[in-house]
Amino acid sequence: MNSLYIAGVWQDGQGEVVNSLNPVTQQVLWSGRGASAAQVEQAVQAARQAFPGWALLSLDQRIAVLEAFAARLKHHADALAQCIGEETGKPLWESATEVTSMVNKIAISVQSYRERTGEKSGPLGDATAVLRHKPHGVVAVFGPYNFPGHLPNGHIVPALLAGNVVLFKPSELTPKVAELTVKCWIEAGLPAGVLNLLQGGRETGIALAANPGIDGLFFTGSSRTGNALHQQFAGRPDKILALEMGGNNPLIVDQVQDIDAAVYTIIQSAFISAGQRCTCARRLLVPEGDWGDALLARLVGVSATIEAGAFDQQPAPFMGSVISLEAARALLDAQRNLLANGALTLLEMRQPQPGAALLTPGIIDVSAVPERPDEELFGPLLQVIRYAGFDAAIAEANATRYGLAAGLLSDSEARYQQFWLHSRAGIVNWNKPLTGAASSAPFGGVGASGNHRASAYYAADYCAYPVASLEAGSLTLPATLTPGIRLS
């Protein structure tokens, strides 16, 4: 199978076998071989050769290609949504919103480029001070499986806009979405070698990250892989590295008047996308006492009515599956381990069908667990922690090595201001779901959640470097010479 796209040509991979499965039916959706180390090198060379021509195009010429890509995404929107749904397991309604986000990324990226990395000039003495930006060159993009179209797109679009050329290694769990996306770029008229598709798993990723011919790497995925990449790039300040690595995100609930609004916001924060968003709430901090008990009772009651279903099920489910049976087993194991260490079941996360990666929402009280693991449990499992006072809640929220998202549900603006001041996270929300990120704002965190390279609206920052110039149209002597220099 022609699984790779290098230098404008589709070719068979020579590396490890990659099979993409529907996570519910286990049907094989895509099968091929990943890129070998030699093919990675071939792609790097193709990108290097394509770089000068692409970088020297005018900004308007590159924008024209990007806008043509947006048009092709719209044309293939139904097919893309279908592909995202069947490969990730997310419901069609949600897959369609992902395609919309991919389309909207073009205009937002153009706006961001002009605002953050465009050209500025002004007089400085007898010269003109000019600020321009240049592309890095050949950059690798490692994409995740949870948003296999939108999140790689969030790196690829601003990278190409800035004049870079791209080596795209998608998740081995979602190769079909990547292939369809690249075909949209081809239809848009992107020149050969400017975007190269390298399917594959761990071995392909290692070969690409280690290739000395790349000038940068943009990654969205797990903390474990991100940390490995950071170590691999240690001592290489000449390479630009942008990492987005998720979080163990806290959501504090204060005593609010509208319990149902709180319950709805908690569910949206914890269980949308089957809990497979980087910003999903992992820890729910609830006040001790009768009000907190009532909130949890209502949350458990409503969550118990949520069923996970196939991506094309009608009527449409709120939740689809997690990405794979392996992921489902790992989440169930994590739940068992927490219960064995003192957690209490409020609503058990279950796998209704043993052969399908469908999980129901789980809610467990981990207040009594002596040493709670500070890990991102990437699925529909919400850990409840009861707190005695608001200061204690903020301290508990910050008790994590991560720092991506944090939220507060409260009727008190004063408490929100206190929470905002003391929260250690890149996204801090008030009375809105944690999962409500926007491409018109930066997206990133601190601590183990990233390396201070916020993406989304700020992706332009890591896709180009600034060049400051002092310019004068003619060479003239200054009115006053520097002391000690005589020209007569």
From Swiss-Prot:
It is an enzyme of class 1 (oxidoreductase). Gene3D superfamilies: Aldehyde Dehydrogenase, Chain A, domain 1 (3.40.605.10), Aldehyde Dehydrogenase, Chain A, domain 2 (3.40.309.10). It comes from the Bacteria. Keywords: Arginine metabolism, NAD, Oxidoreductase. Pathway: Amino-acid degradation; L-arginine degradation via AST pathway; L-glutamate and succinate from L-arginine: step 4/5. InterPro entries: Ald_DH/histidinol_DH, Ald_DH_C, Ald_DH_CS_CYS, Ald_DH_CS_GLU, Ald_DH_N, Aldehyde_DH_dom, SuccinylGlu_semiald_DH_AstD. The active site is at residues 244, 278. One of its GO terms (biological process) is arginine catabolic process to succinate. NAD(+) binds at residues 221-226. GO terms for molecular function: succinylglutamate-semialdehyde dehydrogenase activity. Its EC number is 1.2.1.71. It catalyses: N-succinyl-L-glutamate 5-semialdehyde + NAD(+) + H2O = N-succinyl-L-glutamate + NADH + 2 H(+). Disulfide bonds: none annotated. Belongs to the aldehyde dehydrogenase family. AstD subfamily. Catalyzes the NAD-dependent reduction of succinylglutamate semialdehyde into succinylglutamate. This is N-succinylglutamate 5-semialdehyde dehydrogenase. It comes from Pseudomonas syringae pv. syringae (strain B728a).
